[in-house]
Amino acid sequence: MDPAARVVRALWPGGCALAWRLGGRPQPLLPTQSRAGFAGAAGGPSPVAAARKGSPRLLGAAALALGGALGLYHTARWHLRAQDLHAERSAAQLSLSSRLQLTLYQYKTCPFCSKVRAFLDFHALPYQVVEVNPVRRAEIKFSSYRKVPILVAQEGESSQQLNDSSVIISALKTYLVSGQPLEEIITYYPAMKAVNEQGKEVTEFGNKYWLMLNEKEAQQVYGGKEARTEEMKWRQWADDWLVHLISPNVYRTPTEALASFDYIVREGKFGAVEGAVAKYMGAAAMYLISKRLKSRHRLQDNVREDLYEAADKWVAAVGKDRPFMGGQKPNLADLAVYGVLRVMEGLDAFDDLMQHTHIQPWYLRVERAITEASPAH
């Protein structure tokens, strides 16, 4: 396979955990899920998509149901253990972040990797970055899971690998709030094999938008059930809808596609030959693929309009009475939406988004909050 094809295959669809889906247009918002349903709902495909008559995802739904049982088992085990935790955390537990040595394997221009960096920076978690070559991917040869982001967390003698951006974020947030061992926390987000609409086996993760907290901890973080539900809903929206608007917009025209791949090559880890081939042949390939994505996701003729509508819908959800969805500080949904949009910075799509929607004040507030909290890493 020539370098350009390998780069395109790495960056679309799977190398960045960017699994573009065939079939109907994803719903911009998902119905409220009960806690018991998150093993199979928040971690897997929507019930509507799974139930579509004749869909190959019926097999995936069955697999997720089996995996969901495992998730419920771990959730029940967590609940029993949570009852034994002390209500007050010791001073040592307040400095949990200092115990972790984190290494993030990423593509800098991947929206899912950007989400994780936004979370780590806002929570002042120092980490090392390993930029993965999208052609050879030798940097992650240690892992059977071949998508990025991958986060390796070293805690004393224990080393844990966390996969999937939303699992990474939920697991680390649970760790910071509850003080539970990270080794135990990651068992609450079981990996499950499923078959997507293209008939390809994929890995889904149960409970990935759920923080494993007891009632007191949840009250401390959210203040109420509505805030928790809202955060989870919009985190999933960022993954299931917003992220799928990026490629059709940044590769919308040949000129934009070339500018996007110029940025990818400059920011990524490419050899001289790989970079030159990727810039021109990759741009041409992704320009054509963007047209398929436009049709696949049932976007408007002018795909900018879908991006604008998504941004304004998000701004409306945040509302005028609070600076962030999280209130006075960004929550996980704020960080997810910001992380996805940030990968377009410097491109025409980003400039148009800032000019033609009301999202810029919120975006700059999140950027400032992250900058003020971020440590050197």
From Swiss-Prot:
Q: Which domain of life is it from?
A: Eukaryota
For this UniProt entry, what's an example GO CC term?
A: nucleus
An example of a GO molecular function for this protein is: 12-hydroxyheptadecatrienoic acid synthase activity
Q: Which residues lie on this side of the membrane: Cytoplasmic?
A: 75-377
- PTM remark: Synthesized as a Golgi membrane-associated protein, and the proteolytic removal of the N-terminal hydrophobic domain leads to the formation of a mature cytosolic enzyme.
Q: Which reactions is this enzyme annotated as catalysing?
A: prostaglandin H2 = prostaglandin E2; prostaglandin H2 = (12S)-hydroxy-(5Z,8E,10E)-heptadecatrienoate + malonaldehyde
User: Which residues are annotated with the PTM Phosphoserine?
Assistant: S95
Q: EC number(s) in its UniProt entry?
A: 5.3.99.3
Q: Which UniProt keywords apply?
A: Cytoplasm, Fatty acid biosynthesis, Fatty acid metabolism, Golgi apparatus, Isomerase, Lipid biosynthesis, Lipid metabolism, Membrane, Phosphoprotein, Prostaglandin biosynthesis, Prostaglandin metabolism, Transmembrane, Transmembrane helix
Identify the pathway.
Lipid metabolism; prostaglandin biosynthesis
Q: In which tissues is it expressed?
A: Widely expressed. Expressed in the heart, including apex, inter-ventricular septum, both atria and ventricles, but not in the aorta. Also expressed in fetal heart. Detected in various regions of the brain: cerebellum; occipital, frontal and parietal lobes. Also expressed in the lymph nodes, skeletal muscle, kidney and trachea, but not in the thymus or lung. Overexpressed in colorectal cancer.
InterPro entries in alphabetical order: Glutathione-S-Trfase_C-like, Glutathione-S-Trfase_C_sf, Glutathione_S-Trfase, Glutathione_S-Trfase_N, PGES2, PGES2_C, Thioredoxin-like_sf
| A GO BP annotation | positive regulation of DNA-templated transcription
Q: What sequence ranges are listed for the domain Glutaredoxin?
A: 90-193
**Membrane-side (Lumenal) residue stretches:** 1-57
Q: What is the uppermost EC class here?
A: isomerase
Matching entries from PANTHER family are given as:
MICROSOMAL PROSTAGLANDIN E SYNTHASE-2, PROSTAGLANDIN E SYNTHASE 2
How is this protein named in the record? Prostaglandin E synthase 2
- What organism is listed for this UniProt entry? Homo sapiens
